[in-house]
Amino acid sequence: MAALWLQAFSLLVLMMVSWPGSQAVGGPQHLCGSHLVDALYLVCGDRGFFYNPRRDVDPLLGFLPPKAGGAVVQGGENEVTFKDQMEMMVKRGIVEECCHKPCTIFDLQNYCN
């Protein structure tokens, strides 16, 4: 039943997007919350999609030299550690890509299984 509803919803959205004069194809859009999830269901279909809300970078730090992961103190000021920089880079995901910034259908496809 849910699969039938999803197919009907997908067809309705596709018809709206392809309707002459439709502005929905206009380009990148901000998609947040349930709108983002609905868009992923539409784009990915039966394949589903991948979402990992939080990744731990500690296992990645094992591949780096010991002093790369430690805090650096120069002139009495604490600088951002390498680990903090890694966490900021790894946490970038679909929310940052499609909610904070506009994204395209091709960006969404990167999160399909």
Curated annotation (Swiss-Prot):
Extent of the signal sequence: 1-24
Subcellular location: Secreted
Domain of life: Eukaryota
SMART domains for this protein: IlGF (SM00078)
GO molecular function: hormone activity
InterPro entries in alphabetical order: Insulin, Insulin-like, Insulin-like_sf, Insulin_CS, Insulin_family
Keyword check for Signal: yes
CDD domains: IlGF_insulin_like
Disulfide bond entries: C32-C99, C44-C112, C98-C103
GO cellular component: extracellular space
Propeptide part(s) removed at maturation, as residue ranges: 56-90
Pfam families per the UniProt record, alphabetical: Insulin
Keyword Disulfide bond found: yes
Keyword terms: Carbohydrate metabolism, Cleavage on pair of basic residues, Disulfide bond, Glucose metabolism, Hormone, Secreted, Signal
Bilayer-spanning residue ranges: none
Biological processes annotated in GO: glucose metabolic process
Function: Insulin decreases blood glucose concentration. It increases cell permeability to monosaccharides, amino acids and fatty acids. It accelerates glycolysis, the pentose phosphate cycle, and glycogen synthesis in liver.
Quaternary structure, from the entry: Heterodimer of a B chain and an A chain linked by two disulfide bonds.
Family: Belongs to the insulin family.
UniProt-recorded name of the protein: Insulin
Gene expressing this chain: ins
